[in-house]
Amino acid sequence: GQQNPVDALAPPDAALPALAESDPRVAELLAELLGRDKLAVFLQTDGFVRRVVATVDNLGRAHAPSRMWPVQPTAQRFVVDGTGDAPTTNAAANAARYSAFLAFAEAVPMEPAVALYARLYPLFQQAYEELGYPRRYFNDRLVAVLDQLLQAPEPAGPLQVKLTPVNTDVPNLRPWVRY
């Protein structure tokens, strides 16, 4: 059964389109909430509901495919410190890559955002069922992932990273996307 019902947050939108046709309506509602200019810079609205569901479901796992993220990729490259035999670590300069997105996320008005989520919830639930969870409740998964993120420890220093090996004779022109 449902552990974290959405019904009490706001009633679902009575005029929701089918999930397959929902992108324009979802983008319109997100633009009203966040502003059209910020929406274009920070979020991917094509398949937004499915992207959110897939990303949330994968966040508690070892890999969350970036092609399904509901956010736009950062413009700058991922940078590491260390070469040769030295351990490779996440460079401190990487934090600056996310400062604009962090400011955007912190400025999202929480109560209207939660109400919009509840209004659109039937779409999120349908996308979760289509992902392979027909008898599970997406909001329960969302709450579990949020709890997991909140419990994640703050790293004491730079994180060690490892380049994912790709066995090919073709030189990789963008190795920074493989960390």
PLM regions: where:
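N-terminal Sec/ER secretory leader and immediately downstream segment
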Residues: 2-97
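Proline-rich intrinsically disordered, low-complexity coils
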Residues: 5, 11-12, 17, 24, ...
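Mid-length scaffold segments of soluble, non-membrane domains
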Residues: 79-143
